[in-house]
């Protein structure tokens, strides 16, 4: 009886362990991303060895990709077997499995069996199997697994929640090489992403060779920057090779050809495409261009059709993106040809639907009909809904929040959800902007991406879920000038997209996802040489690398997801054995904190250096006689990018201004300006300074230093300083130039003050600036 009792208890414990294991994967044995729909743990491991055999009937190409990968990492010479063998790995096509991407995977100590009704399903089964092996299986050179090439035994029954799981890659603002795109394809396919939306045409560049219109790449692929001519393009053969590479990994490449807006690069090559036919250049700055294509000309439509004729020969995708977003229609209002076309079509203004919006809808519908002849379905940004008359076959990509997707799905359109408000714009900041690389703005930490549900409740409540094809993250490239930055923005948020697109919503668990990410997936990304984002230690009151104090100072750190932090106070670089941060650090003397995030897998973030500086209050300056409000400014015309450029200038002009905000607009064109004067502070204490100017000083101490930073956005990059109440010297350097596509005027020239660590940064009142 006692034996039977213990047997029952043991069985219950095993059952409970299996049940918990199927939900909480974040252990050393099961770290698959995206989490499978159903995973049942089992005891033991399958061991990959030189004697392992791989058999695949009618799926040899999938099996060969798998074999090539494991041979490269292990140094083995495994070959495909002509027959199924005991103890081997078997891939079988089984038509009884429902769903083209569904699969089953059975891993035991005695063998591995993957089944699916399609090769794509088998490919995904093997991606899951690879994630059961040590992360070093992703190595590009032969290596060793310290504990052997073991895969934890389990049974998986899996299928995706959504048919569409996508990533937009913008190759126009900055050019991605074919090699970089292939690297992304390798990683995306690991995580069961099945669509790349390739953004090929823009105001800033045209990236695809079109043989009928050679000047699109001769002129349109290149733009002028402060560093000279920049650009590049893909030949048709290069793109065909890329498409083939992606198809082998079951990724569909969807081309985007913007129309009628975002096409200044094409208009630069062929000015007759616009209403005014003026000679222009590819747009050297970011933002929305007001010059768009002219739909009043039949030659414009012929151009669009000619481009499509060549693009469909390169991209076999059944989906074709025609853009349609951010197309200002102002020129159409005064263009005789556009107005004539509107009259011919009988369009009139209606509430919420001006006739020019209907003209844009006409462009969409005409091109949809043309693409339909090739068997293509169009995708357009959610603005294509605005003119009405949109065919039900058109797919709407909802980017301005969820509303476009809600309206479209409830009207019977298929939709792809890529909400800029839902964490799916991965060019947004994923940590405190004060310490993160320059970005376009916004805030989308990985927790926000992971929390997104592609089916809005307004769609679900009406039973229209079936119209939601799935989610997509968008990697816009305005602030991604190199491969490292492209990686940094996309990963690991791409893995969160993978899970929200694949895993059943009720099985999502961010804590468990984070464990799988931090303990396993990050090692796999490292093997692919991906420069992924690791949360940096941040100060919750606003990160600052230079904290002044007068008596004592407490410095607090956090991370955007719970991670271990380690630090030193002796000037040395922190490592895995350094002191763990567990509570706020208190200081009564000056010190230097070096602090970094340490992931469970042993990978560390870059080090933050935070100086805490004990200061006496900087004394106030005695007020000059005849105190007068304002600032003195000297400015010199020309393009300057570093403070050192000013050392030898002699062409200064002088004037007075009322506020540092007035440093913009001093004169036409590029110029440098230096403002000097006095600023009044109301009370004794430590002040934190924030500004986007090049450099600023208070009482001859540098408090802002953005010198030689290429991309400026509204982010603090300042210090703190202890000041006595009263007047203090201030000096500000401002460059009115375009840096890496961003005019300085967009960021402004204000200098903001915050008293202490609490509260908000505020602009100084004009009456608190004085001439010195």
Residue ranges of predicted features:
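Feature activates predominantly on carbohydrate-active enzymes
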Residues: 98-319, 335, 366, 370, ...
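Short beta-strand-plus-loop segments that form exposed binding edges in beta-rich domains
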Residues: 732-741
């Amino acid at each position: 009886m006692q034996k039977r009792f213990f047997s029952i208890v043991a069985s219950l414990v095993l059952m409970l362990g299996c049940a918990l294991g199927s939900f909480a994967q974040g252990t050393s044995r099961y770290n698959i991303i995206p989490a499978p729909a159903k995973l049942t743990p089992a005891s033991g491991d399958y061991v990959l060895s030189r004697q392992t055999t791989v058999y695949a009937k009618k799926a040899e190409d999938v099996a060969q990709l798998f074999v090539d990968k494991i041979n490269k990492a292990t140094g083995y010479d495994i070959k495909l077997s002509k027959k199924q063998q005991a103890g081997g790995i078997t891939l079988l096509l089984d038509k009884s499995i429902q769903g083209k991407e569904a699969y089953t995977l059975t891993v035991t100590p005695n063998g591995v069996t993957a089944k699916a009704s399609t090769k794509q399903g088998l490919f995904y089964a093997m991606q899951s199997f690879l994630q059961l092996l040590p992360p070093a299986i992703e190595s590009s050179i032969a290596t060793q697994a310290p504990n052997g090439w073991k895969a934890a035994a389990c049974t998986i029954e899996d299928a995706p929640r959504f048919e569409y799981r996508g990533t937009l890659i913008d190759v126009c603002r900055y050019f991605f090489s074919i090699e970089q795109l292939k690297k992304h394809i390798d990683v995306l396919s690991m995580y069961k992403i099945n669509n790349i939306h390739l953004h090929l045409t823009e105001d800033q560049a045209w990236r695809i060779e079109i043989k009928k219109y050679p000047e699109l790449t001769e002129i349109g692929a290149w733009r002028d920057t402060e560093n000279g001519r920049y650009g590049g393009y893909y030949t048709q053969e290069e793109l065909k090779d890329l498409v083939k590479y992606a198809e082998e990994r079951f990724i569909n490449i969807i081309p985007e050809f913007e129309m009628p807006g975002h096409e200044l690069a094409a208009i630069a090559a062929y000015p007759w495409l616009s209403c005014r036919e003026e000679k222009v250049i590819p747009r050297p700055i970011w933002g929305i261009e007001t010059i768009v294509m002219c739909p009043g000309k039949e030659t414009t439509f012929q151009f669009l059709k000619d481009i499509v004729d060549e693009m469909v020969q390169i991209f076999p995708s059944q989906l074709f993106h025609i853009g349609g977003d951010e197309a200002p229609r102002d020129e159409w209002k005064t263009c005789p040809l556009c107005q004539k076309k509107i009259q011919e079509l009988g369009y009139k203004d209606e509430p919420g639907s001006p006739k020019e919006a209907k003209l844009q809808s006409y462009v969409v519908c005409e091109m949809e009909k043309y693409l339909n002849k090739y068997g293509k379905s169009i995708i357009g940004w959610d603005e294509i809904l605005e003119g009405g008359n949109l065919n039900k076959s058109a797919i709407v990509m909802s980017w301005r929040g969820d509303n476009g997707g809600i309206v479209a799905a409830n009207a019977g359109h298929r939709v792809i959800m890529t909400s800029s408000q839902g964490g799916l714009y991965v060019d947004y900041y994923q940590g405190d902007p004060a310490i993160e690389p320059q970005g376009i703005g916004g805030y989308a930490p990985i927790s926000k991406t992971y929390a997104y549900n592609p089916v809005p409740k307004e769609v679900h409540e009406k039973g229209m879920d079936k119209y939601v094809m799935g989610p997509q993250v968008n990697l816009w490239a305005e602030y991604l000038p190199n491969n490292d930055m492209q990686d940094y923005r996309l990963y690991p948020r791409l893995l969160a997209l993978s899970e929200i697109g694949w895993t059943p919503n009720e099985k999502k668990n961010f804590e468990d996802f984070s464990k799988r990410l931090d303990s396993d997936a990050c090692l796999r990304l490292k093997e692919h040489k991906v420069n992924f984002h690791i949360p940096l230690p941040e100060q919750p009151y606003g990160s600052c690398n230079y904290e002044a104090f007068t008596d004592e100072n407490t410095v607090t750190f956090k991370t955007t997801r719970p991670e271990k932090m380690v630090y030193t106070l002796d000037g040395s670089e922190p490592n895995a054995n350094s002191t763990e941060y567990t509570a706020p650090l208190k200081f009564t003397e000056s010190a230097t904190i070096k602090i970094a995030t340490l992931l469970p897998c042993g990978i560390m973030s870059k080090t933050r250096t935070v100086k805490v500086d004990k200061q006496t209050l900087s004394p106030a300056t005695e007020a000059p006689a005849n105190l007068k409000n304002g600032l003195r400014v000297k400015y010199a015309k020309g393009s300057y990018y570093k403070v050192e450029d000013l050392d030898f200038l002699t062409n200064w002009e002088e004037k007075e201004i009322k506020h540092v905000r007035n440093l913009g607009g001093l004169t036409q064109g590029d110029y440098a300006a230096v403002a000097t004067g006095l600023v009044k502070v109301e009370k004794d204490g430590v002040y934190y300074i924030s500004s986007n100017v090049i450099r600023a000083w208070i009482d001859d101490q540098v408090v802002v230093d953005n010198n030689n930073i290429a991309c400026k956005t509204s982010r603090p990059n300042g210090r703190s300083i202890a000041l006595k109440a009263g007047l203090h010297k201030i000096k500000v350097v401002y460059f009115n130039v375009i840096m890496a596509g961003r005019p300085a005027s967009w960021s402004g020239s204000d200098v903001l003050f915050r008293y202490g660590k609490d509260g908000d940064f505020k602009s100084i009142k004009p009456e608190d600036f004085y001439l010195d």
